[in-house]
Amino acid sequence: MKRPVTGKDLMIVNMGPHHPSMHGVLRLIVTLDGEDVVDCEPILGYLHRGMEKIAENRAIIQYLPYVTRWDYLATMFTEAITVNGPEQLGNIQVPKRASYIRVIMLELSRIASHLLWLGPFMADIGAQTPFFYIFREREFVYDLFEAATGMRMMHNFFRIGGIAADLPYGWIDKCLDFCDYFLTEVVEYQKLITRNPIFLERVEGVGIIGGEEAINWGLSGPMLRASGIPWDLRKVDRYESYDEFEWEIQWQKQGDSLARYLVRLSEMTESIKIIQQALEGLPGGPYENLESRGFDRKRNPEWNDFEYRFISKKPSPTFELSKQELYVRVEAPKGELGIFLIGDQSGFPWRWKIRPPGFINLQILPELVKRMKLADIMTILGSIDIIMGEVDR
């Protein structure tokens, strides 16, 4: 980083990678003129694990447990993108019941992600009480996940052609009860936070992003919608069964940290609407397309070799990726999560390029914090909502 040429004595401060407000192993080299930020340089890569290269040496079903380690607070979305790509390459039809259950799980995961953004964001700017409130509601969401998938996090629930298991007995009633309860809690959040004058002083007019600027930087998700651009892939691409439900895109015009907070808060209410409609209209039928497990062994006799008969040596793939390329995307809680996938007629992807929303959204941070106060860095970074697992991959 070049030191700005000025007549003043500037101070260079390292924030992170262990600072609690960095939300992971993010390091910021901040140049200060007193309390004013002159420059900021993010240093990434502390959590890089080579996720794209690992994908090239795994069958899709083997790779599914890895993808939940990208954004480990919204694992359903990383699983969804991992199975949606091969499904589109192979023209695999997903049963309607499986599609509805996927939507329910995705929206519950969106609520859990937004809740775990809200608590630490409020703690960053000095409000401790909401931090404990959101963990109470988040526990209910994780109880639902545990009942349906067996895991509170890292669910490993999605499969090519459907899901791993059907919903257990009594789960739908339990989820409907949670929806009714959670709507009342969102009203409590609004009373506790939205009208708080100290909170408004910290976030209003801080980190403003214009609509054109947001598009030029490639921002997505609440970062884009808070800048006056009503763009949501659930409406644009109509993946899964989102076009069968009535809900509205939540967006704001101001483009500041308060607008991003309001977008995420109202998105949780819209997610509850989608979940309630999906639960009430949940169709019957199978939860998985079993034909997707078929594999043409005549075309590749190598898979019949002796070593492939033992899973400890070489596991035989159960799905073949056709020789074509595809970009597939979903609307994750943090923005557009995309995969550029290239198949080459084998069980392993030839290329697996990840488009993480947090990494793209983080690029605008140096522009937002310049000419702001040092204390505003926590507010702006918190409003972006990043998880270093998906930023570094």
Swiss-Prot record:
Superkingdom of the source species:
Eukaryota
Q: Which reaction does it catalyse?
A: a plastoquinone + NADH + (n+1) H(+)(in) = a plastoquinol + NAD(+) + n H(+)(out); a plastoquinone + NADPH + (n+1) H(+)(in) = a plastoquinol + NADP(+) + n H(+)(out)
SUPFAM superfamilies hit by this protein: HydB/Nqo4-like
Enzyme Commission number: 7.1.1.-
Q: How is this protein positioned relative to the membrane?
A: Peripheral membrane protein
- One MF annotation (Gene Ontology) recorded for this entry: oxidoreductase activity, acting on NAD(P)H, quinone or similar compound as acceptor
Coarse class of the primary localization is plastid
Q: Enzyme class, one word?
A: translocase
Per UniProt, which keywords does this protein have?
Answer: Chloroplast, Membrane, NAD, NADP, Plastid, Plastoquinone, Quinone, Thylakoid, Translocase, Transport
Entry's Gene Ontology BP terms:
photosynthesis, light reaction
**Which cell locations does it reside in?**
Plastid, Chloroplast thylakoid membrane
| GO-annotated cellular components | chloroplast thylakoid membrane
The family this protein is said to belong to? Belongs to the complex I 49 kDa subunit family.
Q: How does it assemble?
A: NDH is composed of at least 16 different subunits, 5 of which are encoded in the nucleus.
Q: What does this protein do?
A: NDH shuttles electrons from NAD(P)H:plastoquinone, via FMN and iron-sulfur (Fe-S) centers, to quinones in the photosynthetic chain and possibly in a chloroplast respiratory chain. The immediate electron acceptor for the enzyme in this species is believed to be plastoquinone. Couples the redox reaction to proton translocation, and thus conserves the redox energy in a proton gradient.
HAMAP family per UniProt:
NDH1_NuoD
Q: What is this protein called?
A: NAD(P)H-quinone oxidoreductase subunit H, chloroplastic
Name the source organism. Answer: Capsella bursa-pastoris (Shepherd's purse)
